Amino acid sequence: MDEYEAQLLVVEQALLVTTDEQQREELSALRTNLEELLALTRSSETEATNNISTAQTNGDLDDELKRFQSELNDLKEQEQEETDTTDDKQQLEELRAKYNALLGEKCSAPHEHSWGALSYHNALICGVDDELIIDGNGILDVRLRVLFTNPTHREMLPCNYYLEGECRFDEIRCRFSHGALVPGASIKEYNAPDFHKLARNCPVLAKLQDRLWHRGRVLCVNFVEQQCRVRLDGQEHKERERDFPFEELFPLIADEDDELSSDSSESHSTEDSDAANDSDMDDLEAARQARMVELSLFTFKPTEKLGAWEQYTRGIGSKLMANMGYIHGTGLGSDGRGIVTPVSAQILPQGRSLDACMELREAANGDKNYFSVERKLKRAQRRQQAANEKAYARESKRTDVFAFLNGSVLGQAQNSTKTTKTSNLQQHSNKTLNVETVRIADDIRRKQRDIAKVQQSLARNATDAQLQKRLNGQLRAHQQELATLQAQESSLSKEQQTRKSKNKMFAF
């Protein structure tokens, strides 16, 4: 528009200067066109300005309307939130009031094991959590804190220090339970123990010294004294058969085997087609295998694998057992509660009675190889016998006056003995003979004292035949040695007397 005005100004100046009529007409026509163009331009700008102002006015109104609507929506949402919060608080208070009335009550609460299995156990409600939860159906609920009364695993065992309020660890760091949080909707009625249904082979839970409840089976029941003898499952217990009072037992009346059998009977009665029956049987078999696998987690894990000897064979035994439905790691039998460790053959000592074998087993004091006691005794006896033989051989090689006297007195050939005796005794001096005489006299007195002690022992133990036999043997040995010593003393005295008489004969 400024350009048009500048052009109009130039045209007007040219009209003032130009005198030519033709040029003035052209310039006049050009001025008229420029004026019309300027007028049109000004009118279009005015309309555009009006439109812009109108649009701005309409935009401001729309924005104001939007802000007003958003404020209304915010107010509605705030009111809804306040209403929901009020409803949640009211519902939370109602749930708390409902569950606070159950504090201290017994119930049956679920417990999820570390391997994913879920089972119900008797528990005691000890608290209500402050937070609301939403279950799978979208319903608000509250979690309850429960303590299990029959814990079967360490993570279920209540902490004694927590119960007394003195535990220094929090719920995560403590090895024992500070209470399990379970949804209130999952709580069931308390399963009270019925001791009247206790019978032989009835499954029970028994409380041991570790405060855990172990599975076992009833052997016999005494309802008068309220005691029950139970055989504990597994082989980690040294004493598998124990007596428990009723307070330390919990009967397991509803067994899983009965549930599986009832489910199978119902499925057979309700299903008509063979395909449906087959599918039900497959489900039951899968459930049985799952239960067997779960049961294997509770059983004792032996160090020796069942069927480990088949590494030297073709393994036909394990293949046959697998075809019959055996699952490795579980016990024998249809319910998987049989033995897990294979029975090993025990070689008894030859020529020994069963009573002697039992005595050896008691002497071993729980040793696996209790016949090692007998081997140790025999080994010590052989060592002692070998030592005695070596000592006897060493003593037999020694040659002294006593050996000479024994040979001279106890020899078989009398003539040769007398000749040797006289010749050998004549080789010793009088001093040596006197010393030997004193030694033999001391040995004779010592043997006489030993014989007197043995005779006193015989008189004191006249009723014990075995001891009498042994003492009589000792007495005979002492008497024989005494006779030998007396014979040696007699020989020495004769030699000394001979020498004295010779000295008298040569004395003038």
Curated annotation (Swiss-Prot):
Ranges of compositional bias, category Polar residues: 486-495
Zinc fingers typed C3H1-type, residue spans: 158-181
Key words, A-Z: DNA-binding, Metal-binding, Nucleus, Repressor, Transcription, Transcription regulation, Zinc, Zinc-finger
Entry GO CC: nucleus
Bias kind Basic residues: ranges: 499-508
Residues annotated as domain G-patch: 313-359
InterPro entries associated with the record: G_patch_dom (IPR000467), Znf_CCCH (IPR000571)
Any GO MF annotation of the entry: DNA-binding transcription repressor activity, RNA polymerase II-specific
Function: Transcription repressor.
Name of the protein in its database record: Zinc finger CCCH-type with G patch domain-containing protein
